[in-house]
């Protein structure tokens, strides 16, 4: 809870990129790119936000995840994403089974996403199995390698039966990585324009575009303007808030202009970066006056409340007041209250509620 408001991080990962799990040089390159993002975007001059690559970053410890997200951080809930990448990792970078085990540790706070490769011959059966595991949505990773194939498109007819199966099962939230390329994957495979067709064909589904299409923000905004079931997740974009505030301001102004305040979703991409400095900086952030004037938008406290939790809660049918009441007094909440009481307010990453 931040300033008395519900917080839900819509983009986090529980990954294993340990040397033991890496199949080849591509698995090493993938996690090394993540770590380059980590060091490159961290708040300048604040060493407390830098993780040790071998001890902390490569393989996420479940206790550390919960402590960082819900005790040292102000999130009330979080979504565990999935990027399987079986060509790079023996058991996958992340996977639904690992998510399901993690959720058992904090079932009232965590939501898991499944991950399907539509090129797999048993893709439909995987949808069923992962929903049975408890996954509440799906993460689609269009640049994933599979043998000689170097990716697929969200508008390929082979994917349509999977969308339809999700609808039949009552799964409505489709999360897509449409943003920066991660070595060795190709940027063109994350082109956001392939969302256009399925988002219009399947109005029953919500298309949550992680990283809001960056660097193709214009394409994302134009297609989203006509598709009310397309949403922008701020993961990665939000990481610019501290060191590149004007860049972030332009991203936010475009999203507010084209999509409005009800379709922008908070996500930190933790553990690429610690979540708390991103949340603190977002809550303190104001659009520069010239950008407000140009776009005719404002980043108000009411809008921030929607972004940090209200919008994603609505998509997952979560009553935020009831959820906060449910979480009040659980073990993580008690420890967070103790942390808040003992921590003086600071700048980035203060964690003050």
Task: Give a label for each model feature.
Residues 18-20, 90-92, 125, 186-187, ...:
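A short acidic (Asp/Glu
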Residues 23, 136-137, 151-266, 273, ...:
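Catalytic pocket-lining loop regions of alpha/beta-barrel enzymes
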Residues 70-71, 131, 167, 257:
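Non-catalytic positions within long, well-ordered alpha-helices that form the structural scaffold/packing
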Residues 11, 69, 78, 112, ...:
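Divalent metal-coordination and catalytic microenvironments
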Residues 56-66, 92-100, 159, 191-193, ...:
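Well-ordered, non-membrane alpha-helical segments in soluble/globular domains
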């Amino acid at each position: 809870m931040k300033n008395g408001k519900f917080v839900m991080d819509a983009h986090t990962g529980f990954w294993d990129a340990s040397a033991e799990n890496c199949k080849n040089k591509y698995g090493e390159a993938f996690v090394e790119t993540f770590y380059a993002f980590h060091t490159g975007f961290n708040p300048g001059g604040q060493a407390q936000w830098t993780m040790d690559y071998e001890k902390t970053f490569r393989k996420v410890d479940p206790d550390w995840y919960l402590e960082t997200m819900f005790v040292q951080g102000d999130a009330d809930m979080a979504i565990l994403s999935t990027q399987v990448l079986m060509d790079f990792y023996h058991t996958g970078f992340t996977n639904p089974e690992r998510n399901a085990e993690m959720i058992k540790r904090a079932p009232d706070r965590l939501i898991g996403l499944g991950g399907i490769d539509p090129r797999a011959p048993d893709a439909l059966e995987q949808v069923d199995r992962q929903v049975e595991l408890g996954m509440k949505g799906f993460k689609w990773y269009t640049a994933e390698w599979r043998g000689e194939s170097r990716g697929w498109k969200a508008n390929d007819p082979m994917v349509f039966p999977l969308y339809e199966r999700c609808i039949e099962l009552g799964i409505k939230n489709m999360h897509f990585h449409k943003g920066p390329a991660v070595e060795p994957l190709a940027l063109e495979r994350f082109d956001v324009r392939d969302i256009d067709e399925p988002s219009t064909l399947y109005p029953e589904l919500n298309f949550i575009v992680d990283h809001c299409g960056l660097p193709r923000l214009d394409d994302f905004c134009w297609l989203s303007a006509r598709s009310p079931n397309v949403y922008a997740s701020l993961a990665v974009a939000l990481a610019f808030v501290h060191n590149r505030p004007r860049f972030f301001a332009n991203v936010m102004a475009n999203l507010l202009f084209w999509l409005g305040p009800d379709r922008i979703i908070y996500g930190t991409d933790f553990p690429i970066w610690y979540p708390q400095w991103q949340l603190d900086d977002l809550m303190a952030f104001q659009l520069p006056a010239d950008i407000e004037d140009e776009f005719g938008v404002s980043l108000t406290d009411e809008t921030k409340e929607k972004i940090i939790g209200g919008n994603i809660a609505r998509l997952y049918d979560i009553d935020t007041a009831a959820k906060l009441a449910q979480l009040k007094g659980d073990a993580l909440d008690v420890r967070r209250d103790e942390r808040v009481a003992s921590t003086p307010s600071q700048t980035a990453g203060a964690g003050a509620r």
